[in-house]
Curated annotation (Swiss-Prot):
Keywords: Metal-binding, Zinc, Zinc-finger. The keyword Zinc-finger applies. GO terms for molecular function: zinc ion binding. Residues 9-33 are annotated as: Disordered. It comes from the Viruses. The lineage of its organism: Viruses, Duplodnaviria, Heunggongvirae, Peploviricota, Herviviricetes. This is Putative zinc-binding protein ORF78. It comes from Ictalurid herpesvirus 1 (strain Auburn) (IcHV-1).
Length: 400
């Protein structure tokens, strides 16, 4: 008998199927909740163990930006089709509106307007809570710090006196303005979005209205909505130096500034009736007018770090406008020791001091023009002693 070289494995046993039983599962005793099956339970009659904040979080509303199809009905404004309907929870919902009339309808619709807190008076809050008893609107901070503790202690609303506990309480509503309306007077071309994209994001984040800008910065706040941008794709692929500027002023064939009140008229030595040349192709303003337009925009958008995040309260923040032949970038710069609302732009205008910052007042006060219309580059170069003297005087004024 030959021995097997392989070990025989044990055979698997086949499981024996258990007989199935038709007995139902054992019943579990449950306490009576007092709720009839099939009956809808309203949120206003929930037990008191659920707090107002949980009840507030449980309330869900539709997004007003989502629009549903209006079917065969036409637009009520222009009588055209196809029409859509605003999807919100107000009384004027389900109104057929076409795509052309949607921006104006959304702007005038009450569900899309920025709410105002009745407690602290904050204007333009993103999310507010509308009380179910009196309809007053409160921001999140005032709701949790002021209204909610008092309503739990007294049991009544502090604005209308209605009961806020038990079955008499009406649930609140959360109103969110996901996309506030930002008035845009002129559309921004695609080639200029890299210049003002950050500015527009900060404006949308802070949601400053035109009236708020005017109240903060005066009448000049409504002069300009967006900064004047230099089209980067039209610029020459080289740095603009002092020699290029002087040649441009001497060349009468180049296009001149089209503004009636040109900023170059205030420069000492300027010839009467002689408009400044346009250094960048494709523009209708000279370089000084571009910087002045930037100054108006910077003045109306920045005040003691109001726009920019993580900015200290002390000190004045303005913007540094970098002008070069490829792009125009705007960045925040702390210039506490410099004049208020002074526009600084990097010294790319010349090749002597590319790291130096020149103000608009330096251009209008220090630039000198020769009899032939040539620019004197030495007029911008401030002596070292004078610069140290100005710095010391600025520090002494701040200390007092």
């Amino acid at each position: 008998m030959e021995l097997s070289l392989y070990r025989e494995l044990p055979r698997k046993r086949r499981a024996v199927a258990q007989p199935r039983t038709r007995q139902p599962p054992p019943k579990v005793h449950r306490e009576d909740t007092g709720i009839v099956p099939g009956l809808r339970v309203e949120s206003s009659v929930r037990p008191d163990s659920i707090t107002n904040f949980r009840r507030l979080a449980a309330v869900k509303f539709k997004n007003p930006e989502v629009m549903e199809c209006g079917g065969k009905g036409g637009c009520e404004e222009c009588k055209t089709r196809p029409a859509l309907m605003l999807n919100c929870d107000c009384d004027t919902a389900k109104v057929p509106i076409c795509l052309g009339c949607k921006p104006r309808a959304v702007r005038d619709h009450p569900c899309f307007r920025n709410r105002t807190c009745v407690s602290c008076g904050t204007i333009g809050v993103v999310a507010v809570v509308k009380l179910g008893c009196c309809g007053a609107t409160l921001c999140d901070s005032c709701l949790g710090a002021d209204w909610y503790p008092k309503s739990r202690t007294r049991g009544t609303c502090g604005y209308c006196g209605a009961q806020t506990l038990g079955v008499h309480y009406r649930p609140m509503k959360i109103i969110k303005n996901t996309r506030p309306y930002i008035p845009a007077e002129t559309p921004i071309p695609k080639v200029q979005r890299h210049i003002s994209a950050r500015l527009l994001e900060e404006i949308r984040r802070c949601q400053l209205s035109r009236s708020e800008i005017v109240s903060l910065f005066g009448d000049h706040g409504s002069m300009m909505e967006y900064p004047t941008a230099v089209p980067a794709h039209l610029l020459a692929p080289k740095m603009i130096g002092y020699s290029d500027i002087s040649k441009a002023f001497a060349d009468d064939t180049l296009p001149r500034c089209s503004r009636a009140m040109c900023a170059a008229n205030g420069v000492p030595g300027w010839r009467c009736g002689f408009q400044a040349p346009v250094l960048f192709p494709g523009m209708d303003m000279c370089l000084l007018c571009v910087v002045r337009a930037q100054e108006q925009t910077i003045t109306q958008l920045v005040l003691n770090g109001t726009i920019w995040e993580d900015a200290p309260i002390a000190g004045t923040y303005h913007m540094s406008v970098w002008l070069d032949p490829t792009t125009v970038s705007v960045t925040p710069v702390d210039i506490s020791a410099i004049d208020t609302f002074a526009v600084e732009f990097c010294g790319n205008l010349g090749s002597h001091h590319p790291e130096k910052f020149y103000r608009l007042s330096d251009l209008t006060c220090r630039i000198r023009w020769t009899a032939g219309g040539f620019l004197d580059p030495e007029s911008l170069m401030v002596p070292e002693k004078e610069r140290l003297k100005n710095t010391a005087s600025a520090h002494s004024n701040n200390s007092h």
